[in-house]
Amino acid sequence: MKIKTLNPNHVVVFTENNITLFSYDTEVASLFCDGMFLGVTDAWDYSNVTLKNLYLFLREYCTDYIRVGKEPNVNLLHFNEVDNKAIKKFITQRAEEYGVKKVLENR
């Protein structure tokens, strides 16, 4: 296991099977290395700092597909055809579901 610290409250944990972003002790997103599918959980605070780190996590580690939604209504976005604006839009839409207005700094 390897751990990369993004800031004092956010870490990325690398294991044999997945790469996971944590905010404090809560899992935010997990990328499964075998199938390259990423699940984004609902169990986090959607703070601006966490959203920014999720954006950076997606941009750096998600190279194939991102899984959006809950079973049975799951959509897959193919990251080879997605640019940073699309990633930002995805995160913004998820945040707006939870009432977060200011989402990410422009990058």
Each model region followed by its residue ranges:
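Terminal leader/tail segments of proteins
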Residues: 1-107
